[in-house]
A protein has these predicted regions:
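A short, structured loop/turn motif at beta-sheet edges
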Residues: 12-14, 49-57, 180-187, 221-223
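Short hydrophobic-aromatic micro-motifs
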Residues: 1, 15-20, 93-94
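A glycine-rich, hydrophobic loop/mini-helix early in the fold
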Residues: 11-33
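C-terminus-biased signal that marks the final domain/tail of proteins
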Residues: 70-71, 78-79, 88, 111-266
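Short, surface-exposed beta-strand-loop junctions and turns on beta-sheet-rich folds
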Residues: 24-26, 99-102, 109, 232-236
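Aromatic- and glycine-enriched pocket-lining scaffold segments that form the walls
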Residues: 55, 59-95
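Short, small-residue-biased leader/transition segments that mark boundaries at the very start
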Residues: 2-7
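Compact, glycine/acidic-enriched structural inserts
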Residues: 25-67, 252-258
Length: 266
């Protein structure tokens, strides 16, 4: 087995999708438990998407599941992750922690990293006054205050690169974003939404190494199309699931298209 056998973002032909995101310091997995469906952490995504057709089936499967601490190999330790599972009906967040498995309804439909999801949701209380509309003067009616700029209704929306700030910003952006009706408009708008929390090289320095957004991806779960961009290539690349043999056993691999694709006009 190679690292290519490990999946972090996936969807199936029924329209169910799942992604694992870093949850370092909070993730915990368990010893094998008799009477449970014991699933290794690295098998979690293919197990859910290989056995469940929709979110309700996934919720039922989770009742009987025990996420085990079986390592992928001696060379690769357990990845510390939490997960979002979604279909057209909604989304849930799954977090395995020292105090047990937590499953949350995810009404905002986004996930970043730490802190745990329930705390992320609590922190949104701090931003309940934010709006995409221009604000009215509630500071003092006797003081003439000027709306000197557009976008003042969202003053206070975080702009730093911490995971809790990115959670708040991408939730606000997603929940207020307006897309057109076409496939291309929806895909375009999706990349703009996630672009609001991109990490640029040099802005997050961790011991001389820089956090960057390596790639961004989305799926049309009804048509089976996977779209992605990379840090080096902003052109959207698409892979069509239904152009491959779904009932076969061969694993199809597509190398990332990197290097900026620039369209010259003269």
């Amino acid at each position: 087995r190679g690292l290519g056998d490990v999946y972090k973002r996936q969807f199936n032909e029924c329209g169910l999708a799942m992604a694992g995101l870093n949850f370092v310091g909070n993730a915990a997995y368990y010893d094998i438990e008799e009477g449970k469906d014991n699933i290794a952490q690295f098998e979690f995504i293919p197990w859910i998407l290989g056995t469940c057709a929709n979110l309700e089936e996934a919720k039922t499967a989770l009742i009987h599941m025990n996420l085990t601490n079986t390592p992928y190999s001696e060379q690769f330790p357990l990845a510390q992750l939490h997960w979002i599972i979604a279909d057209q009906s909604g989304a849930i967040t799954v977090e395995a922690m020292e105090d047990g498995m937590h499953i949350y309804e995810n009404n905002v439909g986004v996930l970043t990293n730490n802190p745990p999801f329930n705390i992320q949701m609590f922190l949104l209380n701090q931003y309940m006054n934010l709006s995409p509309k221009q604000p009215e003067n509630l500071f003092a009616k006797d003081i003439d205050l000027d709306q000197y700029s557009r976008g003042m209704g969202a003053i206070g929306l975080p702009g730093d690169l911490s995971s809790s700030s990115r959670f708040a910003k991408v939730a606000f952006t997603k929940l207020h974003s307006v897309s057109g009706d076409s496939e291309n408009e929806s895909v375009n708008q999706f990349f703009h939404i996630l672009g609001s929390v991109d990490q640029q090289r040099g802005c997050c320095d961790v011991n001389g190494k820089y956090e960057i957004t390596l790639y961004t991806s989305c799926c049309n779960t009804q048509k089976g199309i996977y779209y992605y961009t990379t840090y080096e290539n902003h052109q959207i690349t698409a892979v069509d699931l239904y152009r491959e043999e779904l009932d076969g056993t061969k694993l199809f691999r597509y190398p990332l298209i990197t290097g900026e694709q620039i369209r010259w006009q003269n």
